[in-house]
Amino acid sequence: MRLILSLPVLAVVLAMVLEGPAPAQAAPDISSAWESIPEKLEEFGRTVKEKVRTAIDHIKKSDFPEKTRKWFSEMFDTLKEKF
C-alpha cells in the first residue's frame, strides 16, 4: 500500500526537479547582488538603531531599573547580616 502511494509522489517530485527553476526563481546577476549590499546594510543599520532606541526608551520609562537596584541592595544587606 505504501509503495503504491509513494510512486506517484516520487514521479511528481522527479518531474519538478527535472523541470528546473522558474524564470522568477532564477539566480540574480552577481553584479546586481553586489550593488544592493550597501543599501541592505544601511537599511539593517537603521532598523537596528530604531529597535535599540525603542528598547532603551522602554527601559527608561519602566520602573525596572529602580526595582533591580532595590532588589540588589536588599540582597546585599541580607548577605551582610549573614556574614
UniProtKB/Swiss-Prot annotation:
Keywords: Lipid transport, Secreted, Signal, Transport, VLDL. It holds the Pfam family ApoC-I. One of its GO terms (biological process) is lipid transport. Gene3D superfamilies: Apolipoprotein C-I. Its main location: secreted. It comes from the Eukaryota. One of its GO terms (cellular component) is very-low-density lipoprotein particle. It is found in: Secreted. GO terms for molecular function: fatty acid binding; phospholipase inhibitor activity. Residues 1-26 form the signal peptide. Belongs to the apolipoprotein C1 family. Inhibitor of lipoprotein binding to the low density lipoprotein (LDL) receptor, LDL receptor-related protein, and very low density lipoprotein (VLDL) receptor. Associates with high density lipoproteins (HDL) and the triacylglycerol-rich lipoproteins in the plasma and makes up about 10% of the protein of the VLDL and 2% of that of HDL. Appears to interfere directly with fatty acid uptake and is also the major plasma inhibitor of cholesteryl ester transfer protein (CETP). Binds free fatty acids and reduces their intracellular esterification. This is Apolipoprotein C-I. It comes from Eonycteris spelaea.
